[in-house]
Structures are given as C-alpha cells and as structure tokens.
Amino acid sequence: MNIIIGLLVTFGCILGGYMAMGGHLEVLNQPFELMIIGGAGIGGFIMANSMKVVKDTGKALGEAFRHKVPKEREYLDTLGVLYSLMRDLRTKSRNEIESHIDNPEESSIFQSAPTVLQNKELTAFICDYVRLIIIGNARSHEIEALMDEEIQTITHDKMKCYHAMTTMGDALPAIGIVAAVLGVIKAMGAISEAPEVLGAKIAAALVGTLLGVFLSYSIVGPLVANIKSVREKQNRLYVIVKQTLLAYMNGSVPQVALEYGRKTISAYERPSIDAVEQEMMNPGGGSESKAA
C-alpha cells in the first residue's frame, strides 16, 4: 500500500506541477524513448545476473508490493517452536526430539506453528542447529560461528536482487542520455524544418533525459530501498533463532532464552512478554483462535 500511495503522490506532484507551469502532457508522451530506456535497462539487468537472481527479483518486487514481512504471529510462532524444542531438550530423550526435527511436517511442535512450517528455509535452520545441540559435542562459540556464517550466506543470497536492481537504477540516467542523443540525432535530420517543428523534436529528445533520471531516483530507487527493508526484516527470524538457542546452550532456562530472541525484534513489531508467555502455555493458540 505504501508503494501505491508513494507512486500516486510522485506522479500527481510531478505531472500536476508541470501542468500548473503551463506544460502540455502530450509532449511527455514519448513511448519509444521509454522503450529505449526500459529495454536497455532490463536487457543489461538480464545480462549481468543469473536467471535465479532475475526470478528472485520478481519475487522480491511482489513481496515489496505486498509488504511481506514477519508479523507478530510469525514471531510468536517462531518463539513458540523454540520454547517447545528447548523444553523437550531438557526433559525428553534424544529419540523423541529427533522425531520432531527429522520430519517437521509430521511434528506436533511444528504443526502448531504453521507460519514456521511454511517457511522451509527457517524450518531447516531450526532443525539443523537443534540437531547439533543434541549431538552434545559442539561448544556454544563453535555453533555461534557456524550460525553467523550461515546467516551471512542467507543474507548475501537474499540481497543479490537488491544489489542488481541498485546497479540497474544507477545506470538509468546514463541510458536516458543515450535516448536523448538518439532523439537529437533524429532532430538534426530536420534542421531545415520550421523552428516550431525542430523545437518539438528537440523537446521530445530531452524527454529521454527526464525519463532516465525520473525512473532512477523516483521509481527504481525507492522500490529498491523497500526491497532491502523487507528482506532485512525476513532475515530477522534467523537472528531470533540464533540468539535464543545460544542463550540456551550457555545455560539459560527456556523462558529466559526466549527473551534473548525477543529482544532482537524491532520495538515496532516486538510482541509483548505477556504474549510470549501466553504462547508458551498455548503454542499456536493465536492462529487457532484466528482460524476459529
């Protein structure tokens, strides 16, 4: 919604201000200039990136428009799963715990947290490190180094589309100049025409420069910033898992270990301690009541 509102404000102010100055919108209607700039930008983007990054960019744009970031329910589900696993680590046998992490789809713990189970990467991350804790030989600082390395890799992969779009956006003003030069070349072919005809052709050529700068700083730039924000918030779930499990490995009881994870959540989205306690007593209760 923020993206739609921002686009409406941007177009409304720019076009409204232009018309208020006495400008004519038909002069800005240069579809072939837009084709040159858009085609060159997208073509360069495809050349510079693998198809995985291209596809992930489309996915990231969809996530940005839908603002697909973790909500309170997802944070509570993640904390609830971690609490249940840590509690079982203290009270149940290795075989019982392995039954949950070997087949999370059939696990009552993960089934009570559908938002976690839907996130295959996060589920695998949790299961992998709980398995390492079960083994019992790894020290907490070794697990921490391993977690940091994996989170860094996940972040690097998720940010590839951000860096790719940033590069494309930075190139658009220069591509706009290319479109403008092509327009000037065309205008020079009509140098013997009447001044008003030549002026119209030069004005059309200058639209290329305008479009390049406008697309770069008013469209692509803000979209890229939104993508970065969304992906960073999605990665926060991994940090929650890391801090919670490390606190448990360092001797904290499950209730206290959850606080280490909860405190890593931004204050704007952080669930209250009462909500976390309720989740510990009734895992997945929020989603069940929501479904009811």
UniProtKB/Swiss-Prot annotation:
Keywords linked to the UniProt accession: Cell inner membrane, Cell membrane, Chemotaxis, Flagellar rotation, Hydrogen ion transport, Ion transport, Membrane, Transmembrane, Transmembrane helix, Transport
PROSITE patterns noted in UniProt: MOTA
Domain of life assignment: Bacteria
Pfam families, A to Z: MotA_ExbB, MotA_N
Primary location recorded for the protein, binned into one broad class: membrane
One GO CC term, this protein: plasma membrane
Keyword Ion transport: yes
Subcellular location: Cell inner membrane
InterPro entries: Flag_MotA_CS (IPR000540), Flagellar_motor_stator_MotA (IPR022522), MotA-like (IPR047055), MotA_ExbB_proton_chnl (IPR002898), MotA_N (IPR046786)
Keyword Iron-sulfur: no
Subunit structure of this chain's protein: Each stator complex is composed of 4 MotA and 2 MotB subunits. 2 A subunits and 1 B subunit are thought to form a single ion channel, so that each stator complex contains two channels.
Family note: Belongs to the MotA family.
Record protein name field: Motility protein A
Organism (species): Rhizobium meliloti (strain 1021)
Lineage: Bacteria, Pseudomonadati, Pseudomonadota, Alphaproteobacteria, Hyphomicrobiales
